[in-house]
Amino acid sequence: LNAFILRYFKDVSSMLADIGRRSRGGTMARLGTILVDLNANRRSSTDNRTNLEFYQTEVERRCGICLSDPLIYEAFTYYDHEVLPYKNDDMINAKAMPGAHAALQAVQDAGLRCALFTNPSFPQGAIECRMGWGELADAPFELVTHMGNATRCKPDATYYLEQLQVMGLEPHEVLMVGNDPKRDFPSPDCGIQTAYVGQGKPGRATWRGTMEDFARDFNAVAEAFYEHQIADELS
């Protein structure tokens, strides 16, 4: 993911510099601070703009470029859909996570709902591109988060709760499956459990293992989820 972020950041900052006829170094620095602020959720708790609206406003304010201008919007949309898909080189090396498809099948077989809660710091086109690289373009996700449908980034609990509201779910009904020891655990804790499929052993994880383990031992994962759910209700 880090390689993807660097490539995307470099390409977008270069495009902004060319469009605004500004130095690439200065534009890269300004865009970097915008993205840091976006991911750190540095704004008022009453600010209900989507991440995309926040990003567009800050780019115009700090870089002097109006991303909502139809021609400029079209240029970046073209990049996301027609250029970015061909950037998956040896450095990015994005591919399907072993066990991911089997895990999705296990969830489907259990009759459960499934959504993709990926960090919404990229526009929809970029998220869809990454899904294609991961062979998830046709996965039956009920909801996929991106800049345009979220008002906060992970791990802010607001991000998780606003998506659950869209789905009509309560936190105690949900199991997050993720591999990021920080971002995939809502902060502050809002009642959502996490099955952790990354490196390390986060103390808050309801279950830990690889994605392949998750698929193979899905019944054990479900059992751990319900045990924690009952314990929380009794506490």
Residue ranges and their predicted role:
Residues 4, 8, 51, 92-99, ...:
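Soluble or luminal CAZymes and related metallo-dependent hydrolases
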